[in-house]
Amino acid sequence: MVTKAKIPLFLFLSALFLALVCSSLALETEDLSNELNPHHDPESHRWEFQQCQERCQHEERGQRQAQQCQRRCEEQLREREREREREEIVDPREPRKQYEQCRETCEKQDPRQQPQCERRCERQFQEQQERERRERRRGRDDDDKENPRDPREQYRQCEEHCRRQGQGQRQQQQCQSRCEERFEEEQRRQEERERRRGRDNDDEENPRDPREQYRQCQEHCRRQGQGQRQQQQCQSRCEERLEEEQRKQEERERRRGRDEDDQNPRDPEQRYEQCQQQCERQRRGQEQQLCRRRCEQQRQQEERERQRGRDRQDPQQQYHRCQRRCQTQEQSPERQRQCQQRCERQYKEQQGREWGPDQASPRRESRGREEEQQRHNPYYFHSQGLRSRHESGEGEVKYLERFTERTELLRGIENYRVVILEANPNTFVLPYHKDAESVIVVTRGRATLTFVSQERRESFNLEYGDVIRVPAGATEYVINQDSNERLEMVKLLQPVNNPGQFREYYAAGAQSTESYLRVFSNDILVAALNTPRDRLERFFDQQEQREGVIIRASQEKLRALSQHAMSAGQRPWGRRSSGGPISLKSQRSSYSNQFGQFFEACPEEHRQLQEMDVLVNYAEIKRGAMMVPHYNSKATVVVYVVEGTGRFEMACPHDVSSQSYEYKGRREQEEEESSTGQFQKVTARLARGDIFVIPAGHPIAITASQNENLRLVGFGINGKNNQRNFLAGQNNIINQLEREAKELSFNMPREEIEEIFERQVESYFVPMERQSRRGQGRDHPLASILDFAGFF
């Protein structure tokens, strides 16, 4: 009987223990329900869920009970999330009241967790306010049309809110991204409102400068402090907006009838006044000063053209511009050909209007033929065709178009570019490096060039006629310490990345050029330079106050930069040295007499030129003289006119008419197979700043005008072991032929042939008057030589 009584007692005690456990769990569930506030944001719910799970692990001893506790935590989390969503959709409460309740909840928590909890409350409050503002804006489109808010001000406030939160870097970037998205959305809405309100008319009167918008957009991208990929995406959006704004501005200008002004130019003084007024209306600060300088330069250029007889628009230049537009705007070869034919018709029609049907004369016809030949000359580049890359009041950097943009005949040198630097006295060119090898010639003034690599820094004083090579990737900077003379440097570049394409990377920026350091995110720069962010911002902002990459400097600083530089003839020490500059004037004269002189630096003699395989030469032809017909065996020479005027004539085996500017594939093969040995005379008048190309094997003669000497600088591509063969003068190659070879070749008695080729007593350079003294029935002194060019 006693044993049977113990069993009910055990069952009673077990039931009592289970009841106590269930009661305890119910209380815990109620506490959890109170702690998981449905009005917290998702991050708060997740944090509290983690706290709940930790309590389950610490307070529940059995594994099964701990799992049950964790499942209850998960159910509570899901329920609170559903309640929060229902309240946001159906019955949202006043944000201020929610914020106060959230703060009260934070005060009940662990003091160590209170700051983080309060920041979450603050963020939730701001987001709810923003949602309400968006809802109000949806119902106030009409009001917004009348009084739109400035998106930039909204963006500034959003950024300030992100900074006040004091979150980690990742949360900061996410917040910045949301600000960016809102900013873009507001901008699109504002543009739509402006279009609906017809603000295009106002924009025609006071248009915003697209370049200023682009600069602000870039500055905004830099302030974000995002990663490199996000920075690039932001920069791409800025470029797209710039292109769109420029198209809109061009459309506005066309509607204002500016095309008529371009076709019928008014008085230059009126154009100058209009240019100045436009600067006053559209520019501010330093950009306004730059705009005024451009107006002044334009007026001076027009004055020079009037003095040279170019007060009316040159049909030839219009034709070249039309041809370039065809090549850049039309994609298919067929459409390019049709476009070029339209250019041809317009050119002929304009010539007919200028000359008139009854005004033909032998002199005008001769001039017309000469202009026609020059217009179809793919080897000649007018100085006005150079494109400006960096321009300021202190100087300019110009570059020639890619050689294959004009014609496929120059494919052999398509990986070379020509760049010209012009700098005023007492100026400094900001440091930069480029992805191209370069050979530089000083064609005016004096300079100090410094380039820096990882191992060393080298500085050289350069004078007129000095040549120096700068390796790809070396950071270089130039000064013009002369107080009176302008500096001019001509460069031949060989890009190392993409054929025919090069880029300049400036270490220090300006208004028109960005420093490559600015593209890096703030955290990268702060860590790499060990400098606070605010100092870096001042560092970059200070640079952008400058107008361009060529700036004025004090004489004291310029002297300090040049005092340790070496000059031509001094050999720098070190195996990795560049080798220093070469003085063309100090080279042994290759050809010289009283009518001209020719100096040349070859890669066989100068290791500085060996890697690029380029020769550099300087020629001075006295006025009224000629460099006799000759050709180069291997080198294709790019010639720059340093000073003077003149002309050249060249024998060319290709059809250089406008219909034959494109030499591709089968057409080239057909031309080679059907070649009849006929040559065309390619000619052009030369003036300072012009560029022309002499392909290897092409006989050419160059003459100086009767008024001034002609000075030329040439870069010979594939210059190693090049030979220059003269076709006239005492040292011509015809005199070296055997007697029988002369008679068989020219079908004349040997005596008559020798009388022709040995008649000239001078070599290399000859006077034009002496060539035509006896007169042999030729219209031009070069005719007797160039007629033979077809044989060679």
UniProtKB/Swiss-Prot annotation:
Compositionally biased residues, Basic and acidic residues: 182-200, 207-217, 302-314, 350-375
Keywords: Allergen, Coiled coil, Copper, Metal-binding, Seed storage protein, Signal, Storage protein
Domain Cupin type-1: 384-537, 582-754
Binding sites annotated in the UniProt record for Cu cation: Y379, C652, H654, H698
CDD domains assigned: cupin_7S_vicilin-like_C, cupin_7S_vicilin-like_N
Region listing for Disordered, in residue ranges: 132-153, 182-217, 240-272, 302-325, 350-394
The keyword Ribosomal protein appears for this protein: no
Feature type site, description Cleavage: D311, R312
GO BP terms in the entry: protein homotrimerization; seed development; seed maturation
Tissue: Expressed in seed (at protein level). Expressed in seed.
Bias type Low complexity, positions: 315-325
GO MF annotation list: copper ion binding; nutrient reservoir activity
Function recorded in the entry: Seed storage protein.
Family: Belongs to the 7S seed storage protein family.
Subunit structure comment from the entry: Homotrimer.
The protein, known as: Vicilin Car i 2.0101
